[in-house]
Amino acid sequence: MSQEYTEDKDVTLTKLSSGRRLLEALLILIALFAVWLMAALLSFNPSDPSWSQTAWHEPIHNLGGAPGAWLADTLFFIFGVMAYTIPVIIVGGCWFAWRHQSTDDYIDYFAVSLRLIGVLALILTSCGLAAINADDIWYFASGGVIGSLLSTTLQPLLHSSGGTIMLLCIWAAGLTLFTGWSWVSIAEKLGGWLLNILTFASNRTRRDDTWVDDEEYDDEYDEETDGVQRESRRARILRGALARRKRLAEKFSNPRGRQTDAALFSGKRMDDDEDIQYSARGVAADPDDVLFSGNRATQPEYDEYDPLLNGHSVTEPVAAAAAATAVTQTWAASADPIMQTPPMPGAEPVVAQPTVEWQPVPGPQTGEPVIAPAPEGYQPHPQYAQPQEAQSAPWQQPVPVASAPQYAATPATAAEYDSLAPQETQPQWQPEPTHQPTPVYQPEPIAAEPSHMPPPVIEQPVATEPEPDTEETRPARPPLYYFEEVEEKRAREREQLAAWYQPIPEPVKENVPVKPTVSVAPSIPPVEAVAAAASLDAGIKSGALAAGAAAAAPAFSLATGGAPRPQVKEGIGPQLPRPNRVRVPTRRELASYGIKLPSQRIAEEKAREAERNQYETGAQLTDEEIDAMHQDELARQFAQSQQHRYGETYQHDTQQAEDDDTAAEAELARQFAASQQQRYSGEQPAGAQPFSLDDLDFSPMKVLVDEGPHEPLFTPGVMPESTPVQQPVAPQPQPQYQQPQQPVAPQPQYQQPQQPVAPQPQYQQPQQPVAPQPQYQQPQQPVAPQPQYQQPQQPVAPQPQYQQPQQPVAPQPQYQQPQQPVAPQPQYQQPQQPTAPQDSLIHPLLMRNGDSRPLQRPTTPLPSLDLLTPPPSEVEPVDTFALEQMARLVEARLADFRIKADVVNYSPGPVITRFELNLAPGVKAARISNLSRDLARSLSTVAVRVVEVIPGKPYVGLELPNKKRQTVYLREVLDNAKFRENPSPLTVVLGKDIAGDPVVADLAKMPHLLVAGTTGSGKSVGVNAMILSMLYKAQPEDVRFIMIDPKMLELSVYEGIPHLLTEVVTDMKDAANALRWSVNEMERRYKLMSALGVRNLAGYNEKIAEAARMGRPIPDPYWKPGDSMDVQHPVLEKLPYIVVLVDEFADLMMTVGKKVEELIARLAQKARAAGIHLVLATQRPSVDVITGLIKANIPTRIAFTVSSKIDSRTILDQGGAESLLGMGDMLYSGPNSTMPVRVHGAFVRDQEVHAVVQDWKARGRPQYVDGITSDSESEGGGGGFDGGEELDALFDQAVNFVTQKRKASISGVQRQFRIGYNRAARIIEQMEAQGIVSAQGHNGNREVLAPPPFE
């Protein structure tokens, strides 16, 4: 045998023919080429030299070398992502050719042509689908050139969805043409696979879910074959497999088993209507069975098998069943009801529920059960006593009834379930209790009951009488119908398992009362079956009454709150307690028990009628009466819910809690009073009343019983306490204001509610315990002047009512408003919860100046740098290797555009890196400037800026953004020697240049600055950085600001600093007046400087300082006695620099127009020597805003990111700003320089600005100059600090002319006096300011208001 096997497996090498040799060698080479091609495609790198890129001097990254890179680039260009399928198709073709090499059939050219057409259709449609639906790969189209052509052709015609559908259809047809497969066969094949998978899974699931172990049957077979000689192991395995297969076949072929499986997996419930009901014994369920009959609680028709309504006695079938069960039938625990059923005689389950006590069923020794009385909190009300609770009717709750009688198990079969069923014990016998009549309660509406109800816990008594044990005798050989008994047993087990897994729907809208669990009745000896059946009728009635009382009991009990639920499955098996469904009794059955429910339709009609009556009654009542009724109803519901929740112990617990809280409150108040008296005993002001414990007598719970008004009452006397009424008012936390102690007014007293709890003391910070808080007379404002904010810890806050006298009792000086309080330090408490909004708009955060509290004056002359955010201590090092790689890449990209250049140096900065290029001889820098966008694309960067000229170097700069941008902090720019050593008070910092060095400028040398950039480019942050740098450099006597902020957002935060000449101007008319005042101030300063013989403001201040050192101040040479109220001749003082900042210059130009342009032009031309400097910022850098007149006098400009090169030329007179990166990236064109410098602006947070502003506010208040924004001085000519513009020389003559002619016109004055139009217009404006003529009307005419002169 082994020789034959060896001879069959010998492999002989047969020689192939020449044609076969050539074919197989060719197939091997083609397969290797496909592998090489796949490697080249997978390792493709766009930087390798290829068909689309020729110049490269670096190593090739492609695994296929230069040919692989070239071929991969070509395939990607033609086919896109479908190029990856080409090697797979090649390998598949080789396999097909090798499989069909032995067939010598003739060639069907028609079939070949169809296959070629199919291949062409598949290739075209695949590329088109990839181009429409897939993302591009590298810089190739996802479908290649083929897909791009198809997608561009189909998109206008069919859109993307229609094109995709059409290409899919063509692809399906091409697959059929190429393979010859029918789509019907493909669908059948796919369906067959799917069904096989589902069949395998379902069969495996069914086999796994069978919880009956097959080993128990193996034991039987082993017992049968004990006497037989042991077979071989192979025979035993085969015999066991055949037997198991036969059993499985019989199991699934049994019609009763199939019906059981259908019942198990159908998802139906036991109470569904069906033709045949299967019980645990495999026969149709009896109609009078409560659990398995399928009768529903909603079935209204009469049922002749109803054990409650058909008039037949229940004792007859029960006696017969009990007698039969005692001999042959087994007791199954699969149909245990959920609702409490009366146990058998002798069973006394103890239910841990305080409301209802269950009594045993009357038997031979026991009488009728007695239901425990309802708790005191249980109040039976008539149905629909409250119309607003009509939506929750009491009959919507299922009322429990007693289940079907339970039968005892035979001793022979009861032992089989001992391991699965819970251990049952025999209770002790008790004497017969006294018979009492059972009261019948009407169930209450469910709206007053809580929704959660824990089930009662049943305590099983200790067993005293065990059951008689009987050994089970198993026959040596199974009887004739043993397999049928086994199938019947397994069917019964399957039905129990089906009852186990019935789905239980969740309640949706109505609150279902709890279903108390039932204790499984113990086994009863057969001799007592008739007696038990005889006493079952009375037991059912008493159980129904007990169930009705349990349904009407309160739905929440503290006694059973933490009890475990017995309806928990603890293993596999239907014998454990589980939530089975019980048929809900009908109204007719409940009527037979004595529980009568009204008709639902009648109750609904009554509820609707009550709601209509309530609505009509409410329509006639006033709002106050409706509100009072609503509060009373809320109070009643709250009291009722509390009584239902806590039962009869609610009032007692409340009183005990009140006593405990009162004692704890008194102890805490005493300790707090002792500590406060010890702290402030010797420091209380005269007339102040001592500390009282009554001041702390408040608690959050008192709001529930407080009926007083919520707003504080202002009465001269002490308000008596009012008797509160318990109302569950919605909690509205109000801040508690502590009334300051007054020496004359009586001490305010707070209302004391009746339920004190733990006090909430007001802890005060001992910052200034000596100085009392100033008292203010505020008869119209209910808020105290110095509040102490405190938020209670409880969610319900008290609402104390305090009093404040409307008028002083006597004319005491304490009620006057003090000019400067001694130490008005308000003592704020940290709120633990956000306070409720107040009725008044007086809030610190709504103040224009913010918090007006006096702050501690700093000791340093200038703000500290600690107010600013420090830069990070760790700085990321420069990656020189990455910069070298980028330099080589720049050279390569320039070489692609036929530009020979070498990177000789690079300068890394925080935001960008500048590469210095050494161009080849004859290469113009303009060529690189024109390629800026192409270079940005090829280098994969956001923007590239080309610097054609680098001062001092023969190179061209190429600025590229860094991959990781760093933040420039203001603190690190201010903390450098260049800023500290600059003596000018107008020194400003801009940021850092590309090398990381700080850029510091002097506004006095600029002398004016124009800032422009789009929204979000960092323009406002740059202006804030310049303002903060001047605040860190100059005192208020050195620099003063006039801030114009049309947006009312950016510059308004500086309101209140001492550097301001006037408030932050937000009205454009006031802005024009402020600019006009600046022009007048410039003229006044020029007069003073000319009188002193100096050329600028610095020389003027030096003269003033020199005269002060000499002790001979210089008098004002232009002062006249009538100019001011000064008695002595005023002297000249030091003049500060004035910086006029305009945040949105374009809005100012649009609103006011030409007048502002003229004023700005005059300031830009002449204001430098007078110490007045302009900073103009705008978001719209257009020629109508930044006119040539303004640009000619403002040489210093800063350009942030703009949208186009035209805007860049408008600002800088050259391009470059359109290539900036934003977020503070700017081009700074300094004075006496034509080449802008790229600067990365310093970042300033809002918190830093507020910190510096608060620091300057603590140093002093601003001294505003009157008349800067007023109209009278703007038109009348008054300007300067204390002077005005003189009237025109022809003013008197022009007034005489106008009053005589009674006609005021500019042209008339111009012709009469032969003067220019501007001078005539100025004279008319002066007349209007003096009130001689009126303003222009809608038609441009003016009325003469002055009377005519006397003749």
Swiss-Prot record:
Transmembrane segments: 25-44, 75-98, 116-132, 163-179
Region of interest called Disordered, as start-end residue ranges on this chain: 357-482, 559-589, 602-871, 1264-1283
Keywords, alphabetical: ATP-binding, Cell cycle, Cell division, Cell inner membrane, Cell membrane, Chromosome partition, DNA-binding, Membrane, Nucleotide-binding, Transmembrane, Transmembrane helix
GO biological process: cell division; chromosome segregation
Record field: compositional bias (Polar residues): 385-395
NCBIfam families: PRK10263.1
The family this protein is said to belong to: Belongs to the FtsK/SpoIIIE/SftA family.
Function as written in the Swiss-Prot or TrEMBL entry: Essential cell division protein that coordinates cell division and chromosome segregation. The N-terminus is involved in assembly of the cell-division machinery. The C-terminus functions as a DNA motor that moves dsDNA in an ATP-dependent manner towards the dif recombination site, which is located within the replication terminus region. Translocation stops specifically at Xer-dif sites, where FtsK interacts with the Xer recombinase, allowing activation of chromosome unlinking by recombination. FtsK orienting polar sequences (KOPS) guide the direction of DNA translocation.
Protein name according to UniProt: DNA translocase FtsK
